């Protein structure tokens, strides 16, 4: 097997002139100088490793720029600088014959770029993390102590409260409707529906049935953002970055002391292409106005008991259930006033009402709002029309995939 550095060097540009460092005048000259020195050192005759200290200076300086003001106001140029800093740090870590812990640190650095930076050099950090993953000998700590366990096995936080559905309010189900029928019966009139049968051939159900150990194997060493707290409207709710292995150990198979953790609304499939190969974009998305590249695919992975408060999405949504079950309740946008949205701009798309335990003294009109409900099971795909309100509670360990499209 070739060394880590040999494989990494092979994906870098052959010459310094092919290594782009094009930035606008918004970037400080001192930062550009650091970037140029790091690049030039890489191509020196002595084949010296990139300075780890200089790479960290670039990362730290650009990190400060990323954390000033709101995220949407961050200039993309500084995100690119951050990614270059991460690239140079990875190159400094991997020069020579690094041990396993250093390779894992390099993977984390790549992930930080993928999460916080911007794509550079034809998404080179995504290619590097693929090389590094193949060099990690053990992606699952203590794997010898584990067996291949199905998701269906009862785990921490599995929910004891089973919903009793009202048959008159259940979301309708249909098996593989034609594009024309889906458009005429559900998309145009904005009616929720559960579509059955369209995930039958997904590799996530066939060649690579998703299990705890499978996720550890393909994504265990990857750093991801998780939400800590029962729901994002709680005061104690927070976010942090940990590896998928750590998330599973602490929040899926760990003790109750760790609280509730949720890998929610994260574009995991862009970060881990192996998982993206296990799913398929529903054909019905072609009825939208955008291209396939405009579809946002998010992962939702967590224990039973996780809750997404009653809220609206900014686009049409197909919610596909791969593992476990979820109770979902939907309300029409016509009932928005009766759902008491938060007044703050930050939470204007979220209701103040606890759906399954409403305070009808404080929110008296909530009981007048008409709703539909369902239990989404593995293989089901729920169409949630644009601006529909919906509430979600995981009944057990669950993995869902959402497709936002316009």
Swiss-Prot record:
The keyword tRNA processing does not apply. One of its GO terms (biological process) is circadian regulation of gene expression. Keywords: Biological rhythms, Cell cycle, Chromatin regulator, Dioxygenase, Iron, Metal-binding, Nucleus, Oxidoreductase, Transcription, Transcription regulation. Residues 270-406 form the JmjC domain. Fe cation binds at residues 311, 313. Pfam families: ARM_KDM8_N, Cupin_8. Its EC number is 1.14.11.27. SMART domains: JmjC. GO terms for molecular function: chromatin binding; histone H3K36 demethylase activity; histone H3K36me/H3K36me2 demethylase activity; metal ion binding; peptidyl-arginine 3-dioxygenase activity. It catalyses: N(6),N(6)-dimethyl-L-lysyl(36)-[histone H3] + 2 2-oxoglutarate + 2 O2 = L-lysyl(36)-[histone H3] + 2 formaldehyde + 2 succinate + 2 CO2. Its cofactor is Fe(2+). Binds 1 Fe(2+) ion per subunit. Residues 143-162 are annotated as: Disordered. Residues 143-152 have a biased composition (Basic and acidic residues). GO terms for cellular component: nucleus. It is found in: Nucleus. InterPro entries: ARM_KDM8_N (IPR056520), Cupin_8 (IPR041667), JmjC_dom (IPR003347). The keyword Thylakoid does not apply. PROSITE patterns: JMJC (PS51184). It is an enzyme of class 1 (oxidoreductase). Coiled coil: none annotated. Its main location: nucleus. Histone demethylase required for G2/M phase cell cycle progression. Specifically demethylates dimethylated 'Lys-36' (H3K36me2) of histone H3, an epigenetic repressive mark, thereby acting as a transcription activator. May play a role in the regulation of the circadian clock. This is Lysine-specific demethylase 8. It comes from Danio rerio. The lineage of its organism: Eukaryota, Metazoa, Chordata, Craniata, Vertebrata.
């Amino acid at each position: 097997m070739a060394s880590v550095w040999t494989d990494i060097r092979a994906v870098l540009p052959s010459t310094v002139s092919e290594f782009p460092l094009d930035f606008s005048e918004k970037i400080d000259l001192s930062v550009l100088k650091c970037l140029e020195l790091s690049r030039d050192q890489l191509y020196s005759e002595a084949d010296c490793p990139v300075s780890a200290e200089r790479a960290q200076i670039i990362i730290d300086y650009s990190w400060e720029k990323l954390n000033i003001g709101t995220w949407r106001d961050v200039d993309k140029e500084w995100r690119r600088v951050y990614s270059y800093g991460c690239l140079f740090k990875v190159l400094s870590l991997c020069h020579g014959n690094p041990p396993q812990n250093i390779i894992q640190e390099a993977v984390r650095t790549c992930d930080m770029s993928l999460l916080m930076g911007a794509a550079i050099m034809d998404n080179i950090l995504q290619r590097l993390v693929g090389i590094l993953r193949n060099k990690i000998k053990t992606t699952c700590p203590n794997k010898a102590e584990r067996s291949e366990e199905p998701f269906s096995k009862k785990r921490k936080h599995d929910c004891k409260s089973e919903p009793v559905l009202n048959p008159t309010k259940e979301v309708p189900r249909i098996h593989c409707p034609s594009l024309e029928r889906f458009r005429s019966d559900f998309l145009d009139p904005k009616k929720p529906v559960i579509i059955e049968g369209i995930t039958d051939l997904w590799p996530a159900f066939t060649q690579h049935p998703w299990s705890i150990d499978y996720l550890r194997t393909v994504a265990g060493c990857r750093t991801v953002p998780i939400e800590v707290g029962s729901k994002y409207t709680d005061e104690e709710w927070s976010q942090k970055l940990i590896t998928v292995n750590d998330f599973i150990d602490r929040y899926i198979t760990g003790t109750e002391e760790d609280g509730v953790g949720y890998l929610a609304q994260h574009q995991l499939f862009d970060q881990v292409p192996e998982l993206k190969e296990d799913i398929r974009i529903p054909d019905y998305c072609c009825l939208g106005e955008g291209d396939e590249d405009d579809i946002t695919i998010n992962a939702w992975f967590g224990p039973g008991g996780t809750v997404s408060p009653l809220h609206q999405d900014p686009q049409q949504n197909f919610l596909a259930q791969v593992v476990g079950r979820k109770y979902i309740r939907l309300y029409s946008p016509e009932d928005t006033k009766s759902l008491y949205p938060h007044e703050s701009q930050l939470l204007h798309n979220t209701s103040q009402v606890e759906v399954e335990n409403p305070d009808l003294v404080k929110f008296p009109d909530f009981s007048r709002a008409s709703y539909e409900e369902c239990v989404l099971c593995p293989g089901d795909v729920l169409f949630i029309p644009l601006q529909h309100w919906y509430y979600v509670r995981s009944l057990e360990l669950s993995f869902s995939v959402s497709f936002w499209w316009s």
